[in-house]
Amino acid sequence: MIFDFPKKFRFADSHEYACPEGDLVRIGISAFAVDQLGDIVFVDLPGIGTLLEQGISFGSVESVKAVEDMNAPIGGEVLQINESVLNSPEELQNDPHGEGWLLLVKPSDASQLDKLMSSEIYSEKVSSK
């Protein structure tokens, strides 16, 4: 399957993305990860004000196949969570790079974005799977 990953996104090895938006970063999971999970039935996210640490679990996503931890692609403070994904997990499945975003974060160190893969490199990585 061919995936179209937005150019401004940066990706972690564990398939979470970070999308810079001014001084903030929107976090979600990639369309590839969503495709691998299958039908998503539940999403667990941290509360507003939670401090995330890069590479450390911040929540989980449950599908009919598995329960997977989600790791923070960047550290920072959670300013907003996507309530609609909590109420309707299929939004994550239908539009993971758009309406299915998970968190809006104020990064503690924006240079952590440089440690993530570009959309081009990530695309090459997942297309070989």
Swiss-Prot record:
GO terms for cellular component: cytosol; glycine cleavage complex. The gene is gcvH. The modification N6-lipoyllysine is found at residue 65. NCBIfam families: gcvH (TIGR00527), PRK01202.1 (NF002270). GO terms for biological process: glycine decarboxylation via glycine cleavage system. Signal peptide: none annotated. This is Glycine cleavage system H protein. Binds 1 lipoyl cofactor covalently. SUPFAM superfamilies: Single hybrid motif. The glycine cleavage system catalyzes the degradation of glycine. The H protein shuttles the methylamine group of glycine from the P protein to the T protein. Belongs to the GcvH family. Its cofactor is (R)-lipoate.
